[in-house]
Amino acid sequence: MKETVIKETSKADLDNPILIEGLPGLGLVGKIATRYLIKQLKAERFASLYSPHFPYFVLVSKKGSIRLLSGAFYSWKNKAGKTDLILFTGDSQAQTIEGQYEISDRLLDFAKKYRVRTIVTIGGYRMEAKDKPKVIVAATGQELLDDAVRAGASVSPAGSPIVGTAGLILGMARFKKIEAVCLLGETRGYLPDPKAAKSVLEVLQSILKIDLDLTGLDEEIAKAEKMVTRLQKIEEKRVSQAVEIRKEEDKKITYIS
């Protein structure tokens, strides 16, 4: 494999869909949100993306079979006659600068093929969120930005970089004449963060005007918060032990003259 390829297993019958992208990143916010959407909407997989820019290993199943790392496209036909969706997530982001650009370009070409006019990218925004994580937004156009702000998002601070596919798609979308908006959930970043993903989905469902049952994330949020509390206690214990060791060492200091 010399370059990124997209293989379709079936044709998706969609009417000017919105494409939602959520690859692994800070706090896995994008992947958690997109996977939850796929499950809630019962979206159907219709294409896969393979790339030599993904990490060089295969995944092994419980039965011992293997598969390459990949990205997956899912389609959802809105029975209410409103916005159809293409949802894209995957096992990894590209591990090279060239790969990030190449995969973003392939995604945009694929979006163009299905007459996508708007793309929503989802990711994490590193921040110590105390209570409810905020959603930070950046967009290629004022209308999309205003829609997100009305839905509860806050405009990204000037100069803040959006790293990876979530950001590059925004930057490259204008060359394909596609509008794009990025929703970033505040997250500590070092653990999977379903709470940040839920905040993003609350904004997204308002923008898309679809009803989602987000209570399924509450159990995952509780598990994540228990893990954070456990790690904080471990860190506090480590610091306390370090202080005690330092005190003991100070007592043992002798001066030789």
Where do the PLM segments sit?
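Hydrophobic/aromatic beta-strand patches that form the interior of the parallel beta-sheet core
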Residues: 47, 86-88, 118-120, 179-184
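Internal, conserved structured core segments that host functional sites
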Residues: 94-145
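Catalytic cores of processing enzymes, dominated by hydrolases/peptidases
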Residues: 128-207
